[in-house]
Amino acid sequence: MPRSPAKTSPRKGSPRKGSPRKGSPSRKASPKRGGKGAKRAGKGGRRRRVVKRRRRRRESYGIYIYKVLKQVHPDTGISSRAMSVMNSFVNDVFERIASEASRLTSANRRSTVSSREIQTAVRLLLPGELAKHAVSEGTKAVTKYTTSR
């Protein structure tokens, strides 16, 4: 049975454009009507299940913060609010280092951010002893990465 191009929706007289999407259930499943919703012989009268779109996962540094916490204080936990604060802190520091490294790269008329720019950005942003420790840990991480390749 051919379908009519414009069907009326449950609202007052406003025509619905096009046909329903593939996989979406029809409004009414009446055996009198010969559309998608009608029961067909031999099919068992089953409807297709509507697949919901999966929501995008939120990225966070939570698992890494937790691992570091357990290295430093194995018997200490962290609340979700404190984890949120720590995640915001890590994101903020990351953004600051990245923007400073980008500024240094453009000041030196280069197009690629290297480990040298990151190191200089860390030295500029972090105070004294903290900068020294961050640089040494960063150098150690880069060395470990290059040797594992």
Swiss-Prot record:
Motif SPKK motif 2: positions: 9-12
Glycosites: 136
Modified residues (Phosphoserine): 19, 24, 30
Basic residues: compositionally biased ranges: 9-20, 29-57
Motif (SPKK motif 5): 24-27
One of the record's GO cellular component terms: nucleus
Keywords: Chromosome, DNA-binding, Glycoprotein, Isopeptide bond, Nucleosome core, Nucleus, Phosphoprotein, Ubl conjugation
Motif (SPKK motif 3): 14-17
Residue(s) of cross-link: Glycyl lysine isopeptide (Lys-Gly) (interchain with G-Cter in ubiquitin): 144
Short sequence motif SPKK motif 6: positions: 30-33
Keyword hit for Nucleus: yes
Region (Disordered): 1-57
Main localization of the protein described in the UniProt heading: nucleus
Modification comment: Monoubiquitination of Lys-144 gives a specific tag for epigenetic transcriptional activation and is also prerequisite for histone H3 'Lys-4' and 'Lys-79' methylation. Phosphorylated on SPKK motifs 4, 5 and 6; which may regulate DNA binding. Dephosphorylated during maturation of spermatids to mature sperm and rephosphorylated at fertilization.
InterPro entries: Histone-fold, Histone_H2A/H2B/H3, Histone_H2B, HISTONE_H2B_site
Function noted in UniProt: Core component of nucleosome. Nucleosomes wrap and compact DNA into chromatin, limiting DNA accessibility to the cellular machineries which require DNA as a template. Histones thereby play a central role in transcription regulation, DNA repair, DNA replication and chromosomal stability. DNA accessibility is regulated via a complex set of post-translational modifications of histones, also called histone code, and nucleosome remodeling.
Complexes and interactors: The nucleosome is a histone octamer containing two molecules each of H2A, H2B, H3 and H4 assembled in one H3-H4 heterotetramer and two H2A-H2B heterodimers. The octamer wraps approximately 147 bp of DNA.
Record remark: domains: Contains 6 SPKK motifs which may interact with the minor groove of A/T-rich DNA sites. Phosphorylation of this motif may regulate DNA binding. This motif is reiterated in both termini of histone H1 and in the C-terminus of plant H2A, but its presence in the N-terminus seems to be unique to sea urchin histones H2B.
Family of this protein: Belongs to the histone H2B family.
Name used for this protein in its record: Histone H2B.3, sperm
Organism: Parechinus angulosus (Angulate sea urchin)
